[in-house]
UniProtKB/Swiss-Prot annotation:
GO biological process, one term: methylglyoxal biosynthetic process
Record gene name: mgsA
Ligand binding (substrate): 12, 16, 38-41, 59-60, 92
SMART domains for the chain: MGS
Family: Belongs to the methylglyoxal synthase family.
Record-given protein name: Methylglyoxal synthase
Species, as recorded: Sinorhizobium fredii (strain NBRC 101917 / NGR234)
Length: 126
């Protein structure tokens, strides 16, 4: 299964548990994907779903968002799920905006909340 699609998972601190729960609810579907995630988010997903193929990159504020952006730019990420916390100020907000911009520029599907992620996963499953 060398040509599996790659999904990037990111969540702000207050949304990490929500993303881990989302991954658990869709574990069977996600098992067909190669997953890249920022460090702490990837750890939470692996705690919830130890059988998933998750590559943990750096923490978002330490460059993980930019690492995922680079993977989008090289065509190595096919889809982005990023659970954003709109109510908390982020010191690395410019990195987040740059990441979203790359997802738009390279026209990959992007979900920024659970409702959209649910639709995206259902669509990608078919």
């Amino acid at each position: 299964m060398a040509d599996r699609k790659c999904l990037a998972l990111i969540a702000h601190d207050q949304k990490k548990n929500d993303l881990a729960a989302f991954a658990k609810a869709h574990e069977a579907t996600l098992s067909g994907w190669k997953i890249v995630a920022t460090g702490t988010t990837g750890g939470r997903v692996l705690d919830a779903c130890p059988g998933l193929d998750v590559t943990r990159l750096k923490s978002g504020p330490l460059g993980g968002d930019q690492q995922i952006g680079a993977l989008i730019a090289t065509g190595d990420v096919d889809c982005l799920i990023f659970f954003v916390d709109p109510l908390t100020a982020m010191p690395h907000d410019v990195d987040v905006k740059a990441l979203m911009r790359l997802a738009i520029v390279y026209d990959i599907p992007m979900a920024l909340n659970r409702a959209t992620a649910e639709q995206l996963i259902d669509f990608r499953r078919t």
